[in-house]
Amino acid sequence: MEKLLHWSIANAQGDKEAIEKAGAPDPKLLEQLFGGGGPDDPTLMKEAMAVIMNPEADLENKLIAYDNFEMLIENLDNANNIENMKLWEPILKTLEDNEADLRASGLSVIGTAVQNNTDSQTNFLKYEGGLKILIAIAKSSEEPSDVRIKAFYALSNLLRNHIEAGKKFQALGGLDVFPVALNDPKATPKLKMRAISALSAFLSSSKIDEQLLDTLRKDGVLVSVIENLGTDNVNVIDRVLSVLSHLISSGIKFNDSELEMLQKEFEKIDSLKDRLNEDDYLAVKYVFSKK
């Protein structure tokens, strides 16, 4: 250690004679001091997945491994390495596990991996059944709320600004998940918020026109969104206003029954207007106030 100290001081001072006299430090000592020589991120990802897929590992260790894996793939390069290392399939396999916590962890990893990451969004869509199982979990009233929330988190990040994902989602009947979640009397405010966020993400990847509006009507999406203006949760109301404002700014026109429903539900939130996004509130109010 003393030799390393002399070498460090000599280097800092630029004293060539002192550097030569001190000699080169032990590389192993440098590794110990500065953390070098440990496994790289891809190796750590493989090791974590090996624990997750090990039938003899207990649930606690699997969940710890999934937490570690998710921290690693917060890095964009590591997230893209999921495809290179062929790890999407084992991740998808955990979504069928009997343990709800493990399913939730898998969904969380998917959501984090594809967040603001076009390459990972595209890679995920290559896997047959991947999007389908996300939709099924989000829609299922048999799933625990925490698991469904994670499914909507994954859907939101997968759909956002990705045209192909939006088309596949709609083709698979994905729009059905929204009225199911928003009309569920047992749905928590957090679940509803995640569902509305996923709808917003879908709209960001879609061409908003009369054809889409007709689809939203037929699938019961539009009515369920408007009805949730009358909820008692400010955060849910704010998300609903954001979606409606998005539709309005895209030029869509509500029919008379929708405007009547909108006005009725809007009256319930008048006392909350100071706690809501002002621009969205006024944009929606203007639509029915001018009729």
UniProtKB/Swiss-Prot annotation:
Keywords: Cytoplasm, Repeat, Translation regulation. The keyword Cell membrane does not apply. SUPFAM superfamilies: ARM repeat. GO terms for molecular function: adenyl-nucleotide exchange factor activity. GO terms for biological process: cytoplasm protein quality control by the ubiquitin-proteasome system; regulation of translation. The keyword Ligase does not apply. Gene3D superfamilies: Leucine-rich Repeat Variant. GO terms for cellular component: cytosol; endoplasmic reticulum. It is found in: Cytoplasm. Belongs to the FES1 family. Functions as a nucleotide exchange factor (NEF) for Hsp70 chaperones which accelerates the release of ADP. Required for fully efficient Hsp70-mediated folding of proteins. This is Hsp70 nucleotide exchange factor FES1. It comes from Candida glabrata (strain ATCC 2001 / BCRC 20586 / JCM 3761 / NBRC 0622 / NRRL Y-65 / CBS 138) (Yeast). The gene is FES1.
